[in-house]
Amino acid sequence: MRAGARKGSHIRRAIEGEDRRRTGLIARVCVLVAVSAALCVAAAVLPRAAAAAPALAPNPAPTAAWTVMVYMDGDQNPGDLYLGSWLTHDIDKEIAAVGSDADVQVVVLADRGRYPSAADGSWTGARVFHVTKGMTATAANAAADWGPTDMGSPQTLVDFVDWARTNYPARHYALFLWDHGWGWWPDNTMEDDTSNDYLDMDELRDALEAVHGVDMVGWDTCLSQTIEVEAQLRGFADAMAGSQDSIGYSGFSYQNILSALQGSPAMSPAALAVVAARSMKTGHDRWTWAASAVSLGRRWDALTTAVSYLGWDLAVRLRDYHRAYAVARRRAASPPQTYPEDRDLYDVAMELRSHVASPAIKRDCTRVLKLERKVVLWQWHVKAEGPVHGIDIFWPSSPAPPQKGSSFEQWMDFPYYCADLNFTRLTDWGDFLTAWGK
């Protein structure tokens, strides 16, 4: 449900009839998820990429167990050429250290934009690689030259997935997204400097709808493991791996991931997500402090329903427990390298249960804790992260009125969180934040 849809009087009326409000909530969430999963966005809806996709090969490879797709956006401004050098490093030193075999095919769309690098030749633009063992990412080794390509366009992602599926069909598909990232926040993830574009979360969901989803998504970006980002994938992926905090340039260890997958090509999407998350610990540098793997199935739906109940009860009891909420929010863990508005979901429930006297809210929190333990398949963090458990949620502070220039004021003035995210369509958390910010 979109936050802001109710006015304050509606919230007050809901206090009297809150039990009626619960009726059918689980059904509503399940129906919305099912409808979203059934929709397919027409290609005309998606903005076209700068360059058309190349012709598909007439003779596709035999069907593999897995096709691993890596969407590598290195088209950054000249001040971030270090990211571009890691693009070449990850292909040559990690992905090509294992390469493809009959069970696991690996394809990469790598965009260096207009900023040439001496590594592997000074090619620019975007190239598609079918990665074989020992390969280097030179122009001569590219399967296709896509030229100037907008990696921030959902159509580019659709074209890449379609190309990979047609040329390298498989029983399962994994998609790794490689770039900077800032969670659900718009105009920050998959930045394409040449096109001045970003792949925002609503566009990502559109693209995944258009290709009928994948089996597993790996976020080789910062701040991805939030319940809001997970909601964008629900219905179009079975599991995801990433970090609820910032990550270093090393990110995933693709060598470890591909070695494990080739050794056990029958592994499930959930198992692959765990392997991917574990690889962050194996190859982490001093900037990668946390990683987790999350299941996006029915248990995730139940967790989202529990968070919706919690958001509703927090909203209708706000006047009674505002101070207790503030204490709980302040005490809840916030990964040190992420936005200060993000809080660890599990720790939020722990602190609310400890500081808020409402029996209903305590029950809601207990339900959230129980379900998150089932949803998080594996998680790891260094001690400096504090008591984090694998999933963040957005909960900004609430100055009254919002202070000029505060991040909360920015959110209140910019309705993306309320209007464009699947999470706020499915739950009442956005309604709570709207009331909380007043």
Describe each model-derived feature in a short phrase.
Residues 30-44:
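Bacterial N-terminal signal peptides
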Residues 39, 49-50, 220:
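Cleavable N-terminal signal peptides
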Residues 43-55:
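Signal peptide processing junction and immediate N-terminal pro/mature segment
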Residues 54-169:
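N-terminal extension/subdomain marker
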Residues 171-185:
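Short acidic, glycine-rich surface-loop motifs adjacent to enzyme active sites
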